[in-house]
């Protein structure tokens, strides 16, 4: 068995991140879609609040399940393979709310679909970060994989922010646009499921018969409290979520303040360009 991560695996890892972050970018337009189908802004906020509470609950639960459940074909890869189906299906369900049903039914549909999407996203997000530790023991290779993932994720954000408004205008509707982009994004995620190898798991099984050290929730919290670099690492997604507010409201700004949705791509560029400059400075 090869002991180093191949170029094909690294490219596949980056492509998975790209597909995943196109899905994440699509959710930035969910608020606009909900109001377009007749759900008021206040009710959209309620839907988001309920889902965020569910998100806080399902993340640690899924982490514990992942530690306890053992598959014959790997620790993380089986979850990633499930996500290739779960994330596009749940994304499409968010953008096909029937316009003719009562408002209450729309809110229920939106809430359940968003909670399902959040669960599906957890299904792909936790394993794609965790699999780095089972692909290689080499710290440089792990850093390389994470860097590749971030680069592809940033590129996905750029592509989604600039092209989605244009694609939507070309295809003529939310449902068609989301279905097409979901199929393309899922295709980007498939190579990772086919070509990645969990070498560390296989070596550990061969060495000690599969014995695995378990950690409690208290151990995890203590580790987080005592490691400032880990705190910074977990703060980064929170900051990124705040930055994504620009993408979420960009279509509203273009539609109601700037005279038309065709301006939305330029609004996205106004957010993305400073982000890229900041990222370049941070690397230095």
Where are these regions (language model features)?
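Membrane-embedded alpha-helical bundles of multi-pass transporters/translocases
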Residues: 2-284
